[in-house]
A protein has these predicted regions:
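Primarily recognizes the serine-hydrolase "nucleophile elbow" in alpha/beta-hydrolase
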Residues: 72-114
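Catalytic active-site module of serine/aspartate enzymes centered on a nucleophile-bearing elbow/loop
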Residues: 169-202
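Short beta-strand/loop motif that positions the catalytic acidic residue
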Residues: 125-126, 130-134
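Acidic catalytic loop of the alpha/beta-hydrolase fold
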Residues: 107-109, 134-141, 163-164
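Serine-hydrolase catalytic machinery in alpha/beta-hydrolase-like enzymes
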Residues: 2-4, 8-71
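Short alpha-helix in the alpha/beta-hydrolase fold that links the catalytic acid
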Residues: 26-28, 113-118, 140-149
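Catalytic histidine neighborhood in serine/cysteine hydrolases
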Residues: 144-145, 149-166
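Catalytic histidine-centered segment of alpha/beta-hydrolase-like enzymes
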Residues: 50, 162-175
Length: 202
């Protein structure tokens, strides 16, 4: 009976600028099965065909897509929990339970303006489990560091690469597995709710 109630947490995976669901899937599935096997990953193409060249041409076949004509899906994803809290987005669906942000940034941070709907998204700390990937050589690293300050108890995986989806070494996989186990304990037992309690700051 207990086996029947177990399910993997479902994660909506949104690709980057001028990429595609298929490209993101190939990159994420390079991660260890010990990580990906614990998750129900759903990959979607953005609604707009990309204009201009993709940086991935020659590595992955087209077509390529864009999300709302701006750089990264992670920027939007970072703002959604705060936008839900303010009652301006996704009002008819359950609250976002967590975010995993690769090369994320903040609307209103050093490099990005603020759309009207997101103006108060970061007006107070976002109490939503978050895991952030920051690349040492990422041109957007400063934006990612600013974003960390917007979340209560953000978890971080640092990697030596640039603006890219990194492979997970043993240390990164351990952090990722820790985040999954901490964030999704009730998901994997079939409970409808989970209680997020940030750990005490050291």
């Amino acid at each position: 009976m207990e086996k029947e109630s177990k399910r993997k947490p479902r994660i909506l995976c949104l690709h980057g600028y001028r990429e595609s669901a298929e490209i993101l899937k190939k990159l994420i599935l390079r991660w260890p099965e010990s990580v990906t096997g614990k998750l129900d990953l759903v990959f979607l193409d953005a609604p707009f065909p990309a204009k201009g060249k993709s940086r991935l041409e020659g590595f992955f076949d087209p077509p390529y897509f864009e999300w709302f004509r701006f750089n990264k899906a992670a920027i939007l994803c970072a703002a959604i929990p705060g936008m839900q809290r303010e009652g301006v987005a996704l009002k008819k669906v359950p609250k976002i339970k967590f975010v995993i942000l690769i090369s994320g940034a903040k609307f209103g941070g050093p490099s990005f303006g603020v759309p009207k709907l997101a103006i108060n998204a970061f007006s107070s700390p976002i109490n939503c489990p978050s895991l952030h990937f920051l690349g040492e050589k990422d041109y957007q690293k400063k934006d990612g560091e600013v974003l960390l300050e917007c979340f209560v108890d953000p978890q971080v995986i640092y990697h030596p690469k640039g603006h890219a989806i990194p492979e997970l070494d043993d240390s990164s996989a351990e952090i990722m597995l820790g985040f999954i186990e901490k964030t999704f304990p009730n998901f994997v037992t079939g409970a409808d709710q989970y209680n997020w309690k940030p750990k005490a700051k050291l």
